[in-house]
Amino acid sequence: MQSMADMLSASGGSQQRCTGIALAEVTAIKDPKNHGRVKCRYLTADKNLGETGWIYCLTPFGGKEYGCFFHPGIGDIVALAYEDGDVHRPFVIGSLWAKKNTPPASVSDGKNEIFKLITPNKSYVEFSDAPKKEHITVSTPKGHRIDLDDENDVISVTDGKNKLDISGKSGSVELTCEKKLTIKVGSGVTITCDGNSGAVEIKTNSKIELNSAKIGVKASGEASVEGSGSVTVKSSGVMTIKGSMTKIN
């Protein structure tokens, strides 16, 4: 099959220059040198026109091991330009949507308010720029989401069953867990809330201190206070110990 350069050479183009832009379909992406190059097949009426060699892809920002990495995939439609008009040196300058490669969003209502970055497997970042309804959503195919919602003044993190809501409007934070919540601080403090049994457990290597103007402790069933060392109960006012039967020692 011919290349673009071969075709121009055969037609008498001795300088083999091309000042226009060509459309092509990506056919290979596994660059043997890992330079981010692709191979493309020209989309022309000439079915004998073959594919390019390994060619580079333009990026809006890039340098050594950093930059904006959005690589074309096999089957993507791309636009090719030519370095200094040399048909031997094409490079990808962008992608195009087409009949078989439709865009991930639309402007059907005539309002350009939704901006989206989405992968082929449907992980996405969506920006809504609608007046007074601005929000940013980050989501995976399984529904793990982060929502930054200016309309409702809420930040939400969810996996579908468990959810964290931070409300700037009400000044509240709500954490909802389906089964179990564990909070760990360093290696010495653990707080566990078990949704199945209803138990709450606090463990620490040091001490637990409650300090308030008034503290009430009430159990609908049995209540016990036990210490492996000394236990002190002290009051600067009246102390009342009351029960249907009271045993001391």
Label the predicted regions.
Residues 33-41:
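Short aromatic-glycine-enriched beta-strand elements
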Residues 41-46, 51-52, 75-80:
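Catalytic cores of peptidoglycan-degrading enzymes
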Residues 31-32, 71:
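Residue-level "contact hotspot" at macromolecular interaction interfaces
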Residues 54-64:
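Short, structured beta-strand/loop micro-motifs enriched in basic residues and often containing a Trp
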Residues 1-11, 18, 23, 69, ...:
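Right-handed beta-helix
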